Amino acid sequence: MTEQTFILGKDAALEDSIAKFQQKLTALGFNIEEASWLNPVPNVWSVHIRDKDCPQCFSNGKGASKKAALASALGEYFERLSTNYFFADFYLGQEIANSDFVHYPNEKWFPIEDDALLPNGILDDYLLDYFBPNAELTPELLVDLQSGNYDRGIVAMPYVRQSDEQTVYIPQSIIANLYVSNGMSAGNTKFEARVQGLSEVFERYVKNKIIAEAISLPEIPKSVMDRYPSIQASIAKLEEEGFPIYAFDASLGGKYPVICVVLLNPNNGTCFSSFGAHPNFQVALERTVTELLQGRSLKDLDVFSPPSFNNDDVAEHANLETHFIDSSGLISWDLLKETPDYEFADWDFSGTTQEEYNNLMAIFRADEKEVYVMDYNHLDVYACRIIVPGMSDIYPADDLIYANNNMGMDWREILLDLPNWHHDAETYQELLEELDGQDIDDATRVREFIGIVAPKNSGWTTLRVGELKSMLHLALGELEQALDWANWTLNMNSSVFTTEPVNYYRTLISIIELHLDQNRDPAQYRAVFEKMYGKDAVKQAWAAVSEGGNPFYNLPASDENLKNFKEHQALLGAYGKLQKAKKENWK
């Protein structure tokens, strides 16, 4: 008989989950490889899996065993496939934008009939008050990045409001801008997945609250830790390696099913915190310890920040955002002080997965929070996305106005065309004025701004708005400004540039400085420049500075079909597999 391993919180054996997930991925046409494994301490495993054909599609898993980590990674992969999360930051092209459906067969399009007023039928009153308290949202802000199809309108998804089971249409733009990956889950059963999604919402909400408010937490008593010898073995190994560990009850007095573990690194005076949530205390504690080391070996524990006494810095939104991304943000010394702000609570919200779901929903009701859920079954794996306004937001609602991910929509066509080097000076001047007028951050990566997968080894992979400004000034023959932005580019990208662009920008800077010097004859220096920097770099930079040559260094041109961008086409190929499954399996 084949081995069957059951773990707390899961409704199927690990072996069955792994086999089912792997078979379904193969049937869908995804070519998954286990790219890296880590087992830095006993009972802590993590794995990184990815699609060999499309590296944008990847996931990570963690667990107390190798099988648990692989099942976790495969579950996360299905969660991201089912919710389209892998594709949330990318333009899907005109063909998909005009197809029967862009995201899901049950999406609803709301035509834009007034540039200033949101169409009727979008959101409910509660959500309108939450997302648009000052009536500042315009329809343009709710056009989704993936379709960029203003003429078609605003695309919204049907979410079920759990308080009364009513369907509410939430624009895809709001979901992608404010909630990113929070509250997404896939599982063996509906309630297993929902419990996971709700737990994640609590984990992130409580984590932010504790960090932002510098709350002091109670340690989990030794008598409670003694119940979990395998978790203690993991912690003991970390402490043996020189990393003191604190395990805290983060339930805020028994209210939320959350644990916090903090690792100190005396070697460089830094620390970092890990949070985990689940209705079962043991599962929450195990998740928190495995999360601490997900994707990290013991050598990777020296990249965090020292604790801080400046609680204003700790509470900054940018710091909380860093914690969401990789937990490397600041935490307050106050979190670690002797006297806690709450008593320890030996909480327990566990039961069957359906009972656990009901227990978690009761917490949201007590907090008077509306919960909205969209279910997905089109890949024959249950998945869901859960939105709890005021709790599961990763970014503030005003990001829709000031930092919308569709801001680059109107720029895509012209920026992709610039390297064709056939525009007039007036166009380059207008682009510079618009970049300043729209107050676009100079550090913005252009590929993210316009939603593309950059061709490997091309300048698009690292191009930022500041570097684009250098190129535009060069196109206008404005050498002093081009020089300023070339220096900015070299400084900004020093950690990401390979040797070739570093050499090109050194060459460009020297050649601009030479041509700005009225007392020197540039021709006298070309030969030595070629010896220093190489003939190819000198030829290209010299042409851009003084011979009317193309200043758009290492940028292949394209159009909005992006046919010559192989990596972007690979992403669209992966999305095509999903679109096929949606057409065939939508229930």
Swiss-Prot record:
Pfam family, one: YcaO
Domain of life: Bacteria
PROSITE patterns with a match to the protein in the record: YCAO
Disulfide bridges in this chain: none
Residue ranges of domain YcaO in the record: 61-426
Membrane-crossing segments per the record: none
InterPro entries, per database record: YcaO-like_dom, YcaO_C
Gene3D superfamilies: 3.30.1330.230
Protein name: Uncharacterized protein HI_1265
